[in-house]
Amino acid sequence: MKIAFLYEHPTWSEKLIDCFHNNDINLQLINIDELTFDTDSFDIDFDLLINRVNVMPYEKRDSAIVFHTLHFLNWLELSGVRIINGARTHYIGSSKVVQNGIFSMLNLDTPRAIAIYKNKDALKAAEKIGFPVIIKPNIGGSGSNIARFNSSVELKLAIDQKLINLGVDGSGLVQKYIASDGYVYRVEILGDELFYSTKQKIVENKFNYCATKGCNINTRNTEQDEEFD
């Protein structure tokens, strides 16, 4: 079996690539930043693709990468190629709207949210949910373009002044703001086991709480990255 490895950030993938090489598994490396593909040709020289492209656009990154990756994954699946982290997974990972729907279907307790695609609809959605609310682009990472509004006056002013940015696909969520205990908690599960958990101090009006050392954020310090049980 020939395996291809689709990646974007070498530093995020080098340990996994090394693990394959150390186990004598050869990979065909594909850098999404350099990828073009012939849609008329189905002469694909690998049987399995591992997708490691980040689904979240953020500042200083070409947002078209998200959609170019999605087109490539769909095209490969139509061609019969097996993919780990395929088109459906990639899309779910990028869409806060779909993620919220999945949380609700699983009966997980999550803040009420209404999906919108017109800025003017944000006010009606917020009044239905109740203030305070936060507005998020459907697709986006690093806390980009997330804003909190405490009243209809604040939100109407932002709408009138065209200050709301719904991101690369022009859609988003109006979501009930839930007061916290001063920390953001991050928990990741691998299979049936806890992979890791962290908590980070909340900084007012900041929504970027990436826990990875490769993230370029100014709010990180040792106290923020405390592990918890």
List PLM regions with ranges.
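Conserved N-proximal alpha/beta basic substrate-recognition cap immediately N-terminal to
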Residues: 8-112
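Phosphate-binding site of ATP-dependent enzymes
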Residues: 147-229
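Rossmann-like NAD(P)H-binding beta-loop-alpha module
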Residues: 106-130
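Structural detector of well-ordered beta-strand residues that form the stable sheet scaffold
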Residues: 83-84, 111, 134, 173-175, ...
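Flexible loop residues that form catalytic
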Residues: 8, 54, 118, 138, ...
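Extreme N-terminal starter segment of soluble prokaryotic enzymes
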Residues: 1-4
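Short acidic active-site motifs
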Residues: 37-38, 121-125, 154
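ATP-grasp fold ATP-binding core
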Residues: 100-104, 126-144, 166-182
